[in-house]
Amino acid sequence: MDEPACNGTSNEWQRPQLIVAGPRAARRRQMLASLDLNTLLALEALLEHRNVTQAARHLGLSQPSVSRALIRLRGVFNDDLLVRGSSGMVPTPHAQRLGQMLPPVLDSIRGMVDPGLDQGEWRLTARMAMPDHQAIVLLPPFLPLMRERAPNLDIVTDSLLALRRLEQGEIDLAVGQIGEAPPGYFRRRLYNDRFACLLRNGHPALEQESIIDTFSALRHAAIASDTKDGFGRVHDDLVKLDLQDPDPVLVSNVLTAGLAIVSTDLVLVVPRRVATRNAALLPLVIVDPPVELPPYEVALIWHERCHRDPDHRWLRQEIAAAATATEQGQSTDAASRQ
């Protein structure tokens, strides 16, 4: 029985090295050295058209150039590849095998040059940082678009908005209130919104001629994540105007707040799009706040590492289209109230 190979200074076993040599290996190296991308493209065109003149026209080359490429291909593969038949050139059996192997090779090379994919063939997961009160606004119009245009794309939303996670590639996009994009990031405005108040249907305050007379006396609800997202400052503004109690009832998210308001006399101040979504699901009434509040702007943020990626660019455009749909919906709602 043969002993394991070992060196002269150690008893450790070493894996024997397999050395590929001989005429066949040399022939393979010579064939690879003789092939280039232009030659493979010529082979593709010749197998498709089975006519040197038509293949040359397809490639934008002269007929003699394609004829020379065919001669070179015959030498590389040691096969005629295309022979004359009664109705034109006919591929040999070896050419037919090459015709089956060639498309995925060239498709891979083309993908290196143009990495954009057909979104209908996507099998990817897009991760977006999006607070829940933005998710209930954007996802209803966005998800049907994705189901139609990119049915295999998975969407995962995260409530945390963190620029560091964008930079490290943990998430792809972030949606929220960002005034200016920091260095290394890009920003696109999605929509502007104004604030509204949510009360339960039948709330005693709705019987008053002006809600401002009772607004400051009402018990308020607030979203616990407001201070992290940005519109918590509206709560502070109302407190300064003595229009909101300084210690509101904190709830974890917008839908929970809506359920709390339905069964109590609490009032919640949120962006109007959020209020509209909640009122569509629950017996709630939307009223204007007692004073004019600063507008609420929602933006899309991404890191520069993804800025030129064609798939990422496509996804950003689809999110912007969904945001535009919410603006059109707001216009329709406003017209119906007039």
UniProtKB/Swiss-Prot annotation:
It comes from the Bacteria. Keywords: Activator, DNA-binding, Nodulation, Plasmid, Transcription, Transcription regulation. Residues 35-92 form the HTH lysR-type domain. The keyword Cytoplasm does not apply. GO terms for molecular function: DNA binding; DNA-binding transcription factor activity. The keyword Transcription applies. Residues 52-72 bind DNA. Transcriptional activator that regulates the expression of genes involved in symbiosis. Among other targets it acts on the nolWBTUV operon. Belongs to the LysR transcriptional regulatory family. This is HTH-type transcriptional regulator SyrM 1. The gene is syrM1.
